[in-house]
């Protein structure tokens, strides 16, 4: 009887320890922290995340351009090439890139590693890490 009580206590203790471990806990980031203009470190590449609201709901769009290639934000046709729909769920950032020439939209999925009010770090499926700094007031 005494051995049974000790075994039950041991199993309960191990269960409590395992349940309290945070191993495997996936970080969760907030979409609002993503809003705004970001510049990729060491490059003239930019990405802007927006959320637009109308009577039917909130639409999340973004756009990206590279001034090093002679393209500015004003060169982009709204909701055309260079634009994407986006969503952030926990650490998974999904961008659906829009093709204005009638081609199929292109999905891209990233894993956000860090997101603060000034820094964004994400990784693509090929393990390429992209690091951005938020442009203040833009």
Placement of each model-derived feature along the sequence:
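C-terminal motif of bacterial Sec signal peptides marking the signal peptidase cleavage site
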Residues: 17-20
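N-terminal helix-cap/turn-to-beta initiation motif at the start of protein domains
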Residues: 23-39
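Short beta-strand segments that buttress and anchor functional surface loops
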Residues: 38-40, 95-101, 120-123
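A structural signal for short, hydrophobic beta-strand segments that form beta-sheets
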Residues: 88, 109-114
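Ser/Thr- and Asn-enriched, surface-exposed coil loops between beta-strands
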Residues: 92, 114-120
């Amino acid at each position: 009887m005494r051995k049974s009580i000790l075994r039950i206590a041991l199993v309960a203790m191990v269960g409590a320890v395992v349940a309290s471990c945070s191993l495997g806990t996936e970080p969760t980031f907030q979409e609002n922290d993503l809003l705004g203009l970001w510049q990729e470190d060491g490059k003239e590449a930019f990405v802007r995340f927006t959320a637009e609201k109308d009577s039917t709901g909130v639409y999340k769009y973004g756009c990206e351009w590279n001034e090093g290639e002679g393209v500015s934000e004003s060169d982009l046709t709204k909701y055309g090439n260079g634009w994407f729909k986006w969503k952030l769920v926990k650490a998974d950032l999904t961008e659906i890139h829009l093709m204005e020439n009638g081609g199929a939209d292109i999905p891209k999925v990233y894993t956000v590693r860090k997101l603060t009010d000034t820094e964004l770090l994400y990784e693509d499926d090929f393990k390429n890490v992209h690091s951005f700094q938020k442009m203040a007031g833009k």
